[in-house]
Regions:
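N-terminal leader/linker segments that initiate helical-solenoid repeat arrays
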Residues: 21-77, 83, 91-92, 102-103, ...
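A structural motif in tetratricopeptide-repeat
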Residues: 33, 67, 101, 135, ...
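Residue-level recognition of tetratricopeptide repeat
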Residues: 36, 70, 104, 138, ...
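Register position in tetratricopeptide repeats
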Residues: 49, 83, 117, 156, ...
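Alpha-helical repeat scaffolds
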Residues: 57, 61, 87-99, 123-135, ...
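TPR alpha-solenoid repeat register
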Residues: 73, 107, 141, 146, ...
Length: 403
């Protein structure tokens, strides 16, 4: 791999010499294709492909003079800014390169979101409409993103009929996304059918909607239906025993921490519903192993709703598969504050990272220490620690915890 990168640099260096000496590039008065600019540009692209976002930003920001001449630079720079959570810089840069006669999905997406957050819905919709025209740059989701965003722009202005009209445009195979957003719109507009729609969704066998037991619970709590909310979680725990969000919600109820459930999400805030929409997109890209694009949408989701900390688990998982162990470990460490369910899950995940980085002994010691800190370990804790011992060939210890 190192040999390949070195070879690429040599080729790029030779290319840069040719470009500098070219009369064609010499005539360009607005931009200078110097050896340093070309080197920084290609170093930035290589860093992006290797998932080194900070390094990519360092190189690309040195060649911002390319922005008016090199459209690919604009896209890569904007994506890098988002991955580094530099949203204000991303908004400003997008404004500086936007033109009416060019369609760039990421630029119109960010400008539309910026206007939407500032409640300038006319300008927001102008950019969201352009997303549909630029769908060829984002074929995985066709024009669904533009339609959902316009639906919420219309909803934010009190136009229920118009908002539902845009959702109706969504076709197969994205009907599951349409159903989710339709229910959130019902909730936003105080529709009396909201609870029934949630119940139909979570019992739908065409798709795994187990996650939305949490959102039904959240909705019931906001409507002071506490006993019904507890019943939803109790029933869903039986059916979806391994779902972290449901398990943690049950734990919140057991400790009378109902407000924590409400703090994650509020259907009266359009930003929260859009954050869930982008989370689902990020999840779909992750399932396709496109972790870079998944992270891009995940960062947007967290920007819109930074209260929904459980969603960070997807980001940590993506980083792990990208072999960005330090970033993954840091995020797992941060989600421990959510509650004991996520804390134990994070501890197991960190132990797995340490297994790759420092070996069995260090990894097992780490998980043992976390286990010993548990105030009231249950059957699942013992069973999962025993499994970890077994998987790492500590058979005698595993037998002890199995029994």
């Amino acid at each position: 791999m190192k040999f390949l990168i070195k070879k690429i640099y040599i080729i790029l260096f030779l290319l840069s010499i040719l470009l500098i000496e070219s009369k064609i590039f010499a005539k360009e008065s607005e931009i200078q294709y110097t050896k340093e600019n070309i080197s920084n540009y290609f170093s930035g692209i290589i860093s992006i492909n290797q998932n080194y976002n900070n390094k990519a930003f360092k190189h690309l920001k040195k060649v911002k003079s390319l922005k008016n001449k090199h459209s690919r630079f604009n896209i890569e720079f904007i994506r890098t800014l988002i991955l580094l959570e530099k949203f204000e810089q991303a908004f400003a840069f997008s404004k500086s390169v936007w033109t009416d006669d060019e369609l760039f999905f990421e630029i119109d997406l960010l400008l539309g979101l910026d206007y939407f957050i500032k409640k300038d819905y006319t300008n927001a919709e102008k950019h969201f409409e352009r997303l549909n025209k630029a769908a060829r740059y984002n074929p995985f989701f066709d024009d669904i993103i533009g339609d959902v965003l316009i639906a919420w722009s219309e909803a934010s202005q009190g136009n229920k009929e118009n908002s539902l009209k845009y959702l109706e445009k969504i076709r197969k195979p994205y009907l599951h996304l349409k159903k989710i957003q339709n229910i959130f719109l019902q909730c936003y507009f105080n529709d009396s059918h909201t609870q029934k729609s949630f119940e139909e969704l979570i019992h739908n066998n065409d798709y795994n909607f187990s996650r939305y037991n949490f959102f039904l619970t959240n909705y019931l709590l906001f409507n002071n239906k506490i006993m019904e909310a507890k019943k939803v979680i109790k029933n869903s725990r039986k059916e979806y025993n391994s779902n972290l969000l449901i398990k943690q919600t049950e734990n919140f109820f057991l400790n009378n921490e109902n407000e924590k459930i409400k703090n994650f999400f509020n259907c009266k805030n359009p930003n929260d519903s859009l954050a869930e929409f982008f989370y689902v997109i990020a999840n779909l890209y992750s399932s396709e192993k496109d972790y870079k694009l998944s992270n891009f949408y995940m960062k947007i989701s967290l920007f819109l709703n930074n209260k929904f900390l459980p969603n960070k688990a997807l980001l940590a998982e993506n980083y792990y598969y990208q072999k960005k162990n330090k970033l993954s470990k840091n995020i797992y460490q941060s989600i421990k504050s959510i509650g004991p369910v996520y804390s134990w899950y994070a501890s197991k995940s960190i132990a797995t990272i340490l297994l790759d980085v420092k070996g069995k002994k260090y990894s097992i010691r780490s998980l043992e220490n976390e286990f010993n800190l548990l105030s009231n370990p249950n059957f699942e804790h013992y069973y999962e620690l025993a499994n970890f011992y077994k998987d790492n060939e500590y058979y005698e210890k595993s037998i002890k915890y199995y029994s």
